[in-house]
Amino acid sequence: MNVGTAHSEVNPNTRVMNSRGIWLSYVLAIGLLHVVLLSIPFVSVPVVWTLTNLIHNMGMYIFLHTVKGTPFETPDQGKARLLTHWEQMDYGVQFTASRKFLTITPIVLYFLTSFYTKYDQIHFILNTVSLMSVLIPKLPQLHGVRIFGINKY
């Protein structure tokens, strides 16, 4: 029973990234994170760029690929209970504008980070591993796949 709900979606998680202004808010949040990290004294610019990239990718991995279910009481009989937010997004349709945006954003951030760290080997390895950790779960071939049973339930 959905008394008092105002949305018409069976699962509001499916359309949240298509909301008005969400992409701009997302980019501004990344910029704000970067500015906050830049304001920490005695931290160099390459370290700040790497921290921005690592924090962004860690947050993206946790919120899109680890957390399952919905924060709402949905009438879908628990179908979304075992799906991550990435799998619920756009009803599972691949290659939508929102999915492309969320795939391209860490890549652009990776390029910026690599440039501003001057391709330092340690920063480069950390940023590459971080990028792969958020890009690989986004592949269509891994939709619904739980590697080694991790995050199965």
From Swiss-Prot:
The chain crosses the membrane at residues 22-42, 43-63, 95-117, 122-142. Its main location: endoplasmic reticulum. Residues 1-17 are annotated as: Important for ceramide level-sensing. The keyword Transmembrane helix applies. The modification Hydroxyproline is found at P137. One of its GO terms (cellular component) is endoplasmic reticulum membrane. InterPro entries: ORMDL (IPR007203). It is a multi-pass membrane protein. The keyword Disulfide bond does not apply. GO terms for biological process: ceramide metabolic process; intracellular sphingolipid homeostasis; regulation of ceramide biosynthetic process; sphingolipid biosynthetic process. When hydroxylated at Pro-137, ubiquitinated via 'Lys-48'-linkage, leading to proteasomal degradation. In endothelial cells, ORMDL3 proteasomal degradation is controlled by the sphingosine 1-phosphate receptor signaling pathway. It is found in: Endoplasmic reticulum membrane. Residues 1-21, 64-94, 143-153 are cytoplasmic. Keywords: Endoplasmic reticulum, Hydroxylation, Membrane, Transmembrane, Transmembrane helix, Ubl conjugation. It comes from the Eukaryota. Residues 118-121 are extracellular. Pfam families: ORMDL (PF04061). Belongs to the ORM family. Ceramides bind to ORMDL3 N-terminus and stabilize it in a conformation that physically restricts the accessibility of the substrates to their binding sites in the serine palmitoyltransferase (SPT) complex, hence inhibiting SPT catalytic activity. In the absence of ceramides, the N-terminus is flexible and permits substrate binding, thus liberating SPT from inhibition. Ceramide-sensitive subunit of the serine palmitoyltransferase (SPT) complex, which is also composed of SPTLC1, SPTLC2/3 and SPTSSA/B. Plays an essential role in the homeostatic regulation of sphingolipid de novo biosynthesis by modulating the activity of the serine palmitoyltransferase (SPT) in response to ceramide levels. When complexed to SPT, the binding of ceramides to its N-terminus stabilizes a conformation that block SPT substrate entry, hence preventing SPT catalytic activity. Through this mechanism, maintains ceramide levels at sufficient concentrations for the production of complex sphingolipids, but which prevents the accumulation of ceramides to levels that trigger apoptosis. This is ORM1-like protein 3. It comes from Bos taurus (Bovine). The lineage of its organism: Eukaryota, Metazoa, Chordata, Craniata, Vertebrata.
